A protein has these predicted regions:
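Noncatalytic linker/hinge segments flanking ATPase motor cores
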Residues: 66-72, 132-143, 174-184
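Stable alpha-helical structural segments in soluble proteins, enriched in small hydrophobic residues
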Residues: 73, 77, 81, 149-158
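RNase H catalytic domain
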Residues: 32-38, 79-149, 162, 167-170
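Acidic two-metal-ion nuclease catalytic site recognized across multiple nuclease folds
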Residues: 2-4, 163-187
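RNase H-like nuclease fold core
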Residues: 2-72, 83-84
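Flexible, glycine- and charge-enriched loops at secondary-structure boundaries
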Residues: 67-71, 75, 113-117
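Short, motif-level signal for alpha-helix interfacial/capping segments enriched in acidic residues
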Residues: 3-12, 76, 119-121, 126
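Glycine-rich, phosphate-binding/catalytic loops in enzymes
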Residues: 43-46, 111-113, 153
Length: 187
């Protein structure tokens, strides 16, 4: 059975990697929107138990999703993070977010009033049957290091993203790291 509780077990003044157990992933997610570009974007910061940090971003311009502006990016970021965790074999993910709907639509504390938020809540609840999803609200724009990085990454997603990327797994990032190390060694 899915657990929908914001445990908030990772104190902000602690190094997140020191608070993660094996098999757990911590993800900071955020969304952004630029009216001039007519695009929404998302940013994810993944922190692994061994201290490695990976980022991912993307954007979209679906007309129905544009109506939700940055909220579409917020939802995409949370969904991308859970899919990444599932693809990588994690048993649990904690999603840190600054927009309340990310948690409250899933838990039912807020009613999903449109098709987009209904699909988001339904999808996340389904995934919650496969992986433990925990939510922690962090204050927006309050100098929480990784939340600020997720915000910057979401803005990059709007401006520089090439659509919504295929959801990777940890092995994809590890392969890219190995290739980069080999290239650096060759230079």
């Amino acid at each position: 059975m899915a657990q929908w509780q914001g445990l908030g077990r990772y104190p902000e003044n602690a190094d997140p990697k020191d608070c993660l157990a094996a098999g757990e992933l911590l993800a900071y997610v955020d969304g952004s929107y630029q009216d001039a570009l007519k695009k929404y974007g998302f940013g994810c910061i993944f922190i692994l138990p061994d201290g490695r940090i990976y980022t991912e971003y993307g954007n979209g311009d679906n007309p129905d999703s544009l109506k939700q502006r940055n909220v579409s990016g917020e939802m995409l970021g949370a969904m991308y993070a859970v899919r990444f965790a599932l693809n990588s074999g994690f048993r649990a993910i904690e999603i840190r977010y600054d927009y309340e709907g990310i948690e409250k639509w899933v838990t039912g504390a807020w009613k999903s009033k449109n098709e987009l938020t209904q699909k988001y809540a339904q999808t996340m609840r389904g995934w919650g049957q496969k992986i433990q999803i925990r939510f922690t609200k962090v204050p927006a724009h309050s100098k929480v290091k990784y939340n600020e990085l997720a915000d910057e990454t979401a803005k990059l997603g709007v401006a520089n993203g090439n659509g919504i990327p295929k959801v990777k797994s940890l092995s994809d990032f590890e392969a890219a790291d190995a290739a980069e190390r080999m290239q650096d060694a060759a230079e």
